[in-house]
A protein has these predicted regions:
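Glycine-rich, often acidic-flanked micro-motifs
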Residues: 2-44, 57-59, 121, 125-134, ...
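An anion/pyrophosphate-binding glycine-rich loop and adjacent beta-alpha core
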Residues: 47
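P-loop NTPase catalytic core of nucleic-acid-dependent motor ATPases
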Residues: 97-133
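Walker A (P-loop) phosphate-binding loop of P-loop NTPases
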Residues: 137
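Conserved lysine of the Walker
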Residues: 140
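Post-Walker A alpha-helix
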Residues: 143-144
Length: 322
């Protein structure tokens, strides 16, 4: 059963009463909220995501609530609760969707240490995952979104979830938060129905959430093997540049973009070393989105990659000293 199989009134009632259970990638979420503005947005943007039986178990138990008190009289706000605990300040209520998406990112960042987590966009084609670690503002979300609507499978625009035991990337296809100048760029490339409401004055400027293609959501149980590691940067008006990196450089750049490399200890080092050892990365800067996508179409091999092991790392960097 999917979100679209519920009527909007039934979805709103379920969210108000006992909440709904749903799945995104490997995670199950229990969401409760009485905010009337959220059900219509979720019904449309989450239409292809799977609903789960309400058996009480979920990885994340989430509530979005309007706080009470003197401030509520002059400014309407919303608070994100995980297991009935609040860990950060409330958001303006008009950007409740952004808080839900950001809060779920926080939940994964804090708890999903069964994976090596890298701040990266990930798309897949022909069995190969293209991992694109990048700092905020690099344009990775826009590049991921454009590739996803050009026939690539979106695994995530935010998290590369790497399984240490086999180096596969676990899909976590979420709404893609398009920001500021990227919004009109993607409006020209995707159906309007896939775009969420315009959310002004967020911490990152104006945001519009883009729903992943149906195929990416439907195949969210299919892991992918790494095929290339790119560190992308959008440089408006500048020529495309592809500059290969050595294994040590790739290792250092990956660790700089990892959420939990140090937290998971030796397992993190071995997994990161194996990634850098098998797939040395490259700097990738581009000033034209169409040119970048055309280049990437020809970058990955057409055959599915072999399965490497963490033990078979090739020549990798030594454990860095502290």
């Amino acid at each position: 059963m999917r979100f679209r199989d519920l009527s909007l009134p039934d979805l709103a009632a379920a969210l108000r009463q006992t909440g709904i259970f749903y799945r995104i990638g490997p995670f199950s979420i229990h969401l409760e909220t009485a905010l009337p503005e959220l059900p219509p947005v979720l019904h449309r943007l989450y239409s292809d995501f799977s609903l789960l039986d309400s058996d009480g178990f979920a990885d994340f138990h989430v509530r979005l609530v309007s706080p009470h008190g003197p401030r509520a009289l002059w400014r309407s706000q919303v608070r994100f609760l995980i297991d009935d605990a609040s860990h950060f300040a409330p958001f303006p209520r008009e950007i409740a969707l952004a808080l839900l998406e950001w809060g779920l990112n926080w939940c994964v960042f804090k708890r999903a240490h069964q994976y090596l987590m890298i701040h990266a966009g990930v798309v897949e084609k022909n069995g190969h995952a293209l991992i694109m670690p990048a700092r905020p503002g690099s344009g990775k979300s826009t590049l991921c979104a454009a590739l996803a609507y050009r026939g690539w499978r979106l695994l995530s625009d935010e998290f590369a979830l790497v399984r240490p035991e086999d180096l596969t990337v676990v899909p976590f296809p979420r709404l893609i938060p398009l920001k500021n100048e990227s919004i009109p760029v993607m409006r020209q490339r995707v159906p309007e129905q896939a775009m969420g409401p315009t959310l002004p004055r967020t911490r990152k400027g104006t945001v519009v959430h883009l729903c992943p293609p149906t195929d990416s959501i439907r195949r969210s149980g299919e892991v992918a093997r790494a095929g290339q590691i790119l560190f992308p940067t959008y440089t408006g008006g500048q020529p495309l540049r592809f500059e290969p990196l050595g294994k040590s450089q790739t290792f250092l750049r990956l660790t700089a973009n990892s959420f939990n490399y140090e937290a998971i200890g030796l397992r993190g080092f071995e997994t990161m070393s194996a990634l850098a050892g098998h797939w040395p990365g490259a700097e990738f800067s581009y000033g034209d989105l169409d040119e970048a996508m055309e280049y990437l179409e020809n970058l990955l091999p057409r055959a599915a990659p072999p399965a490497p092991s963490v033990a078979d790392q090739g020549e990798v960097p030594a454990m860095p000293s502290r």
